[in-house]
């Protein structure tokens, strides 16, 4: 059995099919971890959801910011943006079924035997991996309950940007959501900055990639390697205890798979056509 983590798809099905063919993926034998952002901006969001859902137990998915944005538009608490392609899901005959399936996906996923912990954007420096898993389950429980509509009414916003165990209600859940699905940069103390999305080296003074601060602030190395996506301008990055695998498939980069069951870190990438031009 082979186990792979695959980077952000954002509605790009043909590169996924080509990559899985290259990997000789067999759903009866192998397993895929999708790092999130299955949908939006690309041409085939609804077909991607159908494809991944049909994989059943052969696939596991963590939710990304574009996945949650789709759910918020469906809930009527957000508007689609100009370049969004979420309406193909909303208008599909099986759209409701796909959207309910999507909201039952994970915020984090771990396998101690394989030695990996998956999340869309990253793990804030102030949390251990065990704490991160617990925080993820808090938000998962709300998304899977009748309170999911109320959550989407309160999801958007950049505050609070600092974790406090005393946070409650929507503030607490918003921080958890932002940390797992939107985080790129933090300050030296781990405070979130959700405005800057450029490549490392071009950020304002006083901001650092979250994984650099995590490496510095954590008293001991993480017991599992974090695998994340979300940050296409970062690209493939192996730093300390994190492997980032969003390599910009949507923008004409590549779609990347990281093999998780191998003693050596094997990375396989497939070039992608540009489905959308960068700004």
From Swiss-Prot:
InterPro entries associated with the record: ApaH, Calcineurin-like_PHP_ApaH, Metallo-depent_PP-like
Keywords: Hydrolase
Family matches, as SUPFAM superfamilies: Metallo-dependent phosphatases (SSF56300)
Chemical reaction(s) catalysed: P(1),P(4)-bis(5'-adenosyl) tetraphosphate + H2O = 2 ADP + 2 H(+)
UniProt GO molecular function: bis(5'-nucleosyl)-tetraphosphatase (symmetrical) activity
Keyword presence, Hydrolase: yes
A matching Pfam family: Metallophos
Enzyme Commission number, as recorded: 3.6.1.41
Taxonomic superkingdom: Bacteria
Cited PANTHER family: CYTOCHROME C5 (PTHR40942:SF4), PTHR40942
Family: Belongs to the Ap4A hydrolase family.
HAMAP family, sorted: ApaH
Function of the molecule: Hydrolyzes diadenosine 5',5'''-P1,P4-tetraphosphate to yield ADP.
Protein name (Swiss-Prot/TrEMBL): Bis(5'-nucleosyl)-tetraphosphatase, symmetrical
Organism: Alkalilimnicola ehrlichii (strain ATCC BAA-1101 / DSM 17681 / MLHE-1)
